[in-house]
Amino acid sequence: MSTELWTTPSAYADAFSTATLNSIASGNSILSDLALTNTNGDIFCDVSFNLASASFLAPNFIGIFIYPLNKDTSTYGDGRFGTSAAGIPSGYPGISVGITPTTAAQSGTVSRLLLPAMGCGYKFVLYNGGGVTFASSANTCQYRSYNRAVV
């Protein structure tokens, strides 16, 4: 009988440059400035974020989405959110993470997001549903990828 296991994940790497996540208004999304390629052929990724202290209010969640590189090899997803803009990505893989409505730093991790096929480019999009503009510094978001193994 086979057993399904997870492979050892890669080390965490930046999903966004730190400055990209600074001062994002509540209700806005931002496309990562870092282009990623699934050259390892990994199937899953975990995404972890740390937000500097702010007075977070309801609605209180962070959304994380994956925009694939389109056939034109220059546009990701629907082409929105190259700069911070109002709205939530629709029609693309994503997940939300609840955050506490309080004045404090916030952290969260989502697990097992499906990655695009091997060799395909993609970027992450982060949605601020925290009810307040992000702090002007010290916001970070990283990811790691991995596969499953059947032994």
List the model feature ranges, each with a label.
Residues 60-65, 78-87, 110-113, 137-141:
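"Short basic amphipathic alpha-helical interaction patches in structured regions
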Residues 1-43, 48:
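Solvent-exposed, flexible loop/coil segments flanking beta-strands in beta-rich domains
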Residues 37, 48-52, 100, 111-113, ...:
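A structural detector for beta-sheet-dominated domains
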Residues 67-106:
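Terminal beta-strand-rich extracellular "head" domains
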Residues 41-51, 61-69, 116-141:
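Internal, hydrophobic beta-strand segments that form the core of beta-sheet-rich folds
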Residues 1-15, 118-120, 127-151:
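C-terminal interaction-tip segments
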Residues 54-58:
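Short consensus segments that form the blades of beta-propeller domains
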Residues 95-122, 126-131:
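Beta-sandwich interaction modules
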